[in-house]
Amino acid sequence: MSDNKEDSTVDNSNSTEEVPLPTRFEVELEFVQSLANIPYVTYLLTQQQLLWKDPKFKNYLKYLEYWCEPPYAQCIVYPNALFILKLLNGFMEKATVNEDGLLDGLEDLPKVIQLQGNQWMNEMVERWAN
């Protein structure tokens, strides 16, 4: 038999259609939900760029608390993300801006997340099971 069948798949590599960028809603939802991933939060808090010590990041986390309110909270698949968001904001509220423009008073935050994160994840699973 010859292999003269037409390929039923469409080649979209030359397509001029662009994939739409995610909306702000989608980006913020994805970021908030990523906070339920303790290793990711630990990474954020230990990266070299010290993003988490930037007052702009503090303001962004505070802004994201609207996800804790209806109707936004019902979009959250991992409710523990909201717990972590509130925890981070609690630490951030106590921070002050130093002469370098970075937040001071957050030195213990990475340690707390690393030491307690697994326990929080287990508690979250137990809450879901009940």
From Swiss-Prot:
<dbReference type="Pfam" id="PF05669">
    <property type="entry name" value="Med31"/>
</dbReference>
<dbReference type="InterPro" id="IPR008831">
    <property type="entry name" value="Mediator_Med31"/>
</dbReference>
<keyword id="KW-0539">Nucleus</keyword>
<dbReference type="GO" id="GO:0006281">
    <property type="term" value="P:DNA repair"/>
</dbReference>
<keyword id="KW-0010">Activator</keyword>
<dbReference type="GO" id="GO:0016592">
    <property type="term" value="C:mediator complex"/>
</dbReference>
<keyword id="KW-0805">Transcription regulation</keyword>
<dbReference type="GO" id="GO:0060261">
    <property type="term" value="P:positive regulation of transcription initiation by RNA polymerase II"/>
</dbReference>
<dbReference type="GO" id="GO:0051123">
    <property type="term" value="P:RNA polymerase II preinitiation complex assembly"/>
</dbReference>
<dbReference type="GO" id="GO:0032968">
    <property type="term" value="P:positive regulation of transcription elongation by RNA polymerase II"/>
</dbReference>
<comment type="subunit">
    <text>Component of the Mediator complex.</text>
</comment>
<dbReference type="GO" id="GO:0006311">
    <property type="term" value="P:meiotic gene conversion"/>
</dbReference>
<dbReference type="GO" id="GO:0003713">
    <property type="term" value="F:transcription coactivator activity"/>
</dbReference>
<protein>
    <recommendedName>
        <fullName>Mediator of RNA polymerase II transcription subunit 31</fullName>
    </recommendedName>
</protein>
<keyword id="KW-0804">Transcription</keyword>
<comment type="similarity">
    <text>Belongs to the Mediator complex subunit 31 family.</text>
</comment>
<comment type="function">
    <text>Component of the Mediator complex, a coactivator involved in the regulated transcription of nearly all RNA polymerase II-dependent genes. Mediator functions as a bridge to convey information from gene-specific regulatory proteins to the basal RNA polymerase II transcription machinery. Mediator is recruited to promoters by direct interactions with regulatory proteins and serves as a scaffold for the assembly of a functional preinitiation complex with RNA polymerase II and the general transcription factors.</text>
</comment>
<dbReference type="GO" id="GO:0070847">
    <property type="term" value="C:core mediator complex"/>
</dbReference>
<dbReference type="InterPro" id="IPR038089">
    <property type="entry name" value="Med31_sf"/>
</dbReference>
